[in-house]
Protein backbone atom coordinates (compact mmCIF):
# COMPACT_ATOMS: atom_id res chain seq x y z
CA UNK A 1 0.00 0.00 0.00
CA UNK A 2 1.34 3.39 -0.97
CA UNK A 3 0.69 6.94 0.23
CA UNK A 4 0.41 8.00 3.89
CA UNK A 5 -0.55 4.55 5.12
CA UNK A 6 2.52 3.04 3.50
CA UNK A 7 4.72 5.58 5.27
CA UNK A 8 3.44 4.79 8.77
CA UNK A 9 5.85 1.93 9.61
CA UNK A 10 8.83 4.06 8.66
CA UNK A 11 7.51 7.00 10.67
CA UNK A 12 6.98 4.81 13.73
CA UNK A 13 10.51 3.44 13.48
CA UNK A 14 11.92 6.96 13.16
CA UNK A 15 9.94 8.19 16.18
CA UNK A 16 11.04 5.23 18.29
CA UNK A 17 14.65 5.72 17.27
CA UNK A 18 14.50 9.40 18.16
CA UNK A 19 12.95 8.67 21.55
CA UNK A 20 15.66 6.11 22.28
CA UNK A 21 18.53 8.43 21.35
CA UNK A 22 20.46 9.64 24.42
CA UNK A 23 20.01 13.28 25.39
CA UNK A 24 23.42 14.47 26.58
CA UNK A 25 21.81 17.52 28.12
CA UNK A 26 19.95 15.33 30.61
CA UNK A 27 21.12 13.22 33.50
CA UNK A 28 22.91 10.09 32.41
CA UNK A 29 25.08 7.35 33.86
CA UNK A 30 28.19 8.65 35.64
CA UNK A 31 31.36 8.69 33.59
CA UNK A 32 34.29 6.49 34.55
CA UNK A 33 37.68 8.02 35.28
CA UNK A 34 39.24 6.57 32.13
CA UNK A 35 36.48 8.12 30.01
CA UNK A 36 37.24 11.54 31.47
CA UNK A 37 40.97 11.13 30.90
CA UNK A 38 40.40 9.95 27.33
CA UNK A 39 38.25 12.99 26.54
CA UNK A 40 40.88 15.31 28.00
CA UNK A 41 43.64 13.57 26.05
CA UNK A 42 41.77 14.32 22.82
CA UNK A 43 41.15 17.95 23.76
CA UNK A 44 42.99 20.81 22.05
CA UNK A 45 43.16 24.53 22.86
CA UNK A 46 40.75 25.13 19.99
CA UNK A 47 38.43 22.30 21.00
CA UNK A 48 38.37 21.80 24.79
CA UNK A 49 36.63 18.75 26.21
CA UNK A 50 32.88 19.23 26.61
CA UNK A 51 31.34 17.56 29.66
CA UNK A 52 28.13 19.62 29.60
CA UNK A 53 25.46 17.97 31.74
CA UNK A 54 27.57 14.90 32.44
CA UNK A 55 28.07 13.21 35.81
CA UNK A 56 31.63 13.06 37.12
CA UNK A 57 30.56 12.58 40.72
CA UNK A 58 32.81 10.71 43.12
CA UNK A 59 35.73 10.34 40.72
CA UNK A 60 39.36 10.76 41.78
CA UNK A 61 40.57 13.48 39.41
CA UNK A 62 43.23 14.93 41.68
CA UNK A 63 45.99 16.77 39.84
CA UNK A 64 44.30 16.44 36.44
CA UNK A 65 44.67 19.23 33.85
CA UNK A 66 41.20 19.99 32.49
CA UNK A 67 42.55 22.15 29.63
CA UNK A 68 39.77 24.77 29.73
CA UNK A 69 37.04 22.10 29.64
CA UNK A 70 33.36 22.93 29.54
CA UNK A 71 31.79 21.65 32.76
CA UNK A 72 28.50 23.53 32.41
CA UNK A 73 25.70 21.82 34.37
CA UNK A 74 28.16 19.05 35.20
CA UNK A 75 27.72 17.00 38.39
CA UNK A 76 30.87 16.88 40.51
CA UNK A 77 29.37 15.73 43.80
CA UNK A 78 32.16 14.57 46.15
CA UNK A 79 34.63 14.54 43.26
CA UNK A 80 38.31 14.71 44.25
CA UNK A 81 39.80 17.67 42.36
CA UNK A 82 42.65 18.42 44.76
CA UNK A 83 45.51 20.18 42.96
CA UNK A 84 43.61 19.93 39.67
CA UNK A 85 44.30 22.47 36.93
CA UNK A 86 40.90 24.05 36.32
CA UNK A 87 42.09 27.35 34.93
CA UNK A 88 39.62 28.89 32.44
CA UNK A 89 37.10 26.07 32.75
CA UNK A 90 33.37 26.77 32.62
CA UNK A 91 31.48 25.68 35.73
CA UNK A 92 28.25 27.58 35.16
CA UNK A 93 25.31 25.82 36.84
CA UNK A 94 27.58 22.92 37.85
CA UNK A 95 26.81 21.01 41.06
CA UNK A 96 30.01 20.42 43.02
CA UNK A 97 28.67 19.89 46.51
CA UNK A 98 31.22 18.38 48.90
CA UNK A 99 33.82 18.30 46.12
CA UNK A 100 37.49 18.60 47.12
CA UNK A 101 39.30 21.49 45.39
CA UNK A 102 42.17 21.67 47.90
CA UNK A 103 45.07 23.60 46.32
CA UNK A 104 43.34 23.49 42.93
CA UNK A 105 43.90 26.22 40.33
CA UNK A 106 40.55 27.73 39.30
CA UNK A 107 41.94 30.98 37.91
CA UNK A 108 39.78 32.74 35.30
CA UNK A 109 37.02 30.13 35.57
CA UNK A 110 33.45 31.10 34.70
CA UNK A 111 31.13 29.79 37.39
CA UNK A 112 27.76 31.51 37.34
CA UNK A 113 25.39 29.91 39.86
CA UNK A 114 27.81 27.08 40.64
CA UNK A 115 26.75 25.00 43.65
CA UNK A 116 29.74 24.63 45.97
CA UNK A 117 27.91 23.88 49.19
CA UNK A 118 30.18 22.10 51.68
CA UNK A 119 32.97 21.99 49.08
CA UNK A 120 36.59 22.20 50.22
CA UNK A 121 38.69 24.90 48.54
CA UNK A 122 41.46 25.20 51.11
CA UNK A 123 44.53 26.96 49.68
CA UNK A 124 42.91 27.05 46.23
CA UNK A 125 43.69 29.80 43.71
CA UNK A 126 40.42 31.42 42.69
CA UNK A 127 41.78 34.44 40.80
CA UNK A 128 39.54 36.42 38.41
CA UNK A 129 36.78 33.82 38.76
CA UNK A 130 33.18 34.82 38.02
CA UNK A 131 31.02 33.60 40.91
CA UNK A 132 27.80 35.56 40.42
CA UNK A 133 24.94 33.93 42.36
CA UNK A 134 27.17 31.03 43.43
CA UNK A 135 26.30 29.00 46.52
CA UNK A 136 29.29 28.64 48.86
CA UNK A 137 27.27 27.82 51.95
CA UNK A 138 29.31 25.79 54.47
CA UNK A 139 32.25 25.64 52.04
CA UNK A 140 35.82 25.78 53.36
CA UNK A 141 37.98 28.40 51.61
CA UNK A 142 40.56 28.69 54.39
CA UNK A 143 43.83 30.01 53.00
CA UNK A 144 42.36 30.44 49.52
CA UNK A 145 43.28 33.34 47.22
CA UNK A 146 40.02 34.76 45.93
CA UNK A 147 39.67 37.66 43.48
CA UNK A 148 36.71 38.49 41.27
CA UNK A 149 32.99 39.21 41.24
CA UNK A 150 30.69 37.16 43.46
CA UNK A 151 27.66 39.44 43.64
CA UNK A 152 24.59 37.95 45.31
CA UNK A 153 26.43 34.76 46.22
CA UNK A 154 25.52 32.75 49.30
CA UNK A 155 28.32 32.05 51.75
CA UNK A 156 26.48 31.33 54.98
CA UNK A 157 28.70 29.62 57.55
CA UNK A 158 31.52 29.34 55.01
CA UNK A 159 35.11 29.32 56.30
CA UNK A 160 37.45 32.01 55.00
CA UNK A 161 40.04 31.57 57.75
CA UNK A 162 43.19 33.48 56.71
CA UNK A 163 41.81 33.64 53.17
CA UNK A 164 43.15 36.41 50.93
CA UNK A 165 40.27 38.35 49.37
CA UNK A 166 42.07 41.69 49.40
CA UNK A 167 42.96 43.94 46.51
CA UNK A 168 45.80 42.65 44.33
CA UNK A 169 48.41 45.45 44.11
CA UNK A 170 50.33 43.60 41.40
CA UNK A 171 47.55 43.74 38.82
CA UNK A 172 46.23 47.27 39.04
CA UNK A 173 47.19 47.95 35.43
CA UNK A 174 44.23 45.70 34.59
CA UNK A 175 41.94 47.78 36.78
CA UNK A 176 41.31 47.25 40.47
CA UNK A 177 41.44 43.50 41.04
CA UNK A 178 39.49 42.71 44.16
CA UNK A 179 36.51 40.75 45.40
CA UNK A 180 33.18 42.31 44.48
CA UNK A 181 30.96 40.93 47.23
CA UNK A 182 27.96 43.20 46.77
CA UNK A 183 24.89 41.73 48.50
CA UNK A 184 26.71 38.50 49.41
CA UNK A 185 25.31 36.61 52.39
CA UNK A 186 28.23 35.95 54.76
CA UNK A 187 25.99 35.37 57.77
CA UNK A 188 27.67 33.06 60.26
CA UNK A 189 30.84 32.86 58.14
CA UNK A 190 34.27 32.49 59.73
CA UNK A 191 36.54 35.25 58.40
CA UNK A 192 39.16 34.93 61.12
CA UNK A 193 42.39 36.57 59.96
CA UNK A 194 41.03 37.14 56.45
CA UNK A 195 42.47 39.86 54.21
CA UNK A 196 39.45 41.94 53.17
CA UNK A 197 41.37 45.04 52.12
CA UNK A 198 39.30 47.13 49.67
CA UNK A 199 36.73 44.35 49.23
CA UNK A 200 33.35 45.68 48.10
CA UNK A 201 31.02 44.61 50.89
CA UNK A 202 28.20 46.93 49.87
CA UNK A 203 24.92 45.60 51.32
CA UNK A 204 26.65 42.36 52.29
CA UNK A 205 25.15 40.49 55.24
CA UNK A 206 27.79 39.58 57.83
CA UNK A 207 25.36 38.91 60.66
CA UNK A 208 27.03 36.70 63.26
CA UNK A 209 30.24 36.39 61.24
CA UNK A 210 33.58 35.95 63.00
CA UNK A 211 35.88 38.82 61.98
CA UNK A 212 38.58 38.23 64.58
CA UNK A 213 41.86 39.73 63.27
CA UNK A 214 40.32 40.35 59.83
CA UNK A 215 41.70 43.33 57.88
CA UNK A 216 38.98 45.68 56.59
CA UNK A 217 41.29 48.51 55.53
CA UNK A 218 39.67 50.33 52.62
CA UNK A 219 36.75 47.88 52.41
CA UNK A 220 33.47 49.47 51.30
CA UNK A 221 30.86 48.82 53.99
CA UNK A 222 28.02 50.88 52.53
CA UNK A 223 24.82 49.33 53.86
CA UNK A 224 26.66 46.23 55.10
CA UNK A 225 25.01 44.41 57.99
CA UNK A 226 27.43 43.60 60.81
CA UNK A 227 25.05 42.74 63.62
CA UNK A 228 26.29 40.35 66.30
CA UNK A 229 29.70 39.95 64.66
CA UNK A 230 32.42 38.27 66.69
CA UNK A 231 35.87 39.73 67.22
CA UNK A 232 34.94 43.34 66.53
CA UNK A 233 37.57 44.68 68.91
CA UNK A 234 40.35 42.89 67.04
CA UNK A 235 39.31 43.90 63.50
CA UNK A 236 42.16 45.68 61.75
CA UNK A 237 41.52 48.77 59.62
CA UNK A 238 37.87 49.22 60.57
CA UNK A 239 38.58 52.90 61.18
CA UNK A 240 39.90 53.15 57.60
CA UNK A 241 37.04 51.29 55.95
CA UNK A 242 34.93 53.24 53.46
CA UNK A 243 31.37 54.11 54.52
CA UNK A 244 31.83 52.39 57.89
CA UNK A 245 29.46 55.01 59.30
CA UNK A 246 26.75 53.67 56.99
CA UNK A 247 27.18 50.04 58.00
CA UNK A 248 24.63 48.50 60.35
CA UNK A 249 26.06 47.44 63.72
CA UNK A 250 24.21 46.57 66.93
CA UNK A 251 24.79 50.04 68.34
Give the positions of each predicted feature.
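Bacterial N-terminal signal peptides
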Residues: 9-19
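Tandem repeat scaffolds
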Residues: 24-251
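Bacterial N-terminal signal peptides that target proteins for export
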Residues: 1-11
Amino acid sequence: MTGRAGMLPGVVVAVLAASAAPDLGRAQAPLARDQVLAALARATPQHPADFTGMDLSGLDLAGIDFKRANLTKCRLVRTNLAKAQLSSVTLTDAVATEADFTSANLDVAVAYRVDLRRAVLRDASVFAVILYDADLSDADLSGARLIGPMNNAKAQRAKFIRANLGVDPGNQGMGIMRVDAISVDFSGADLTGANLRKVLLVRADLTGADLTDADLTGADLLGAILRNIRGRDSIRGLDRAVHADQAVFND
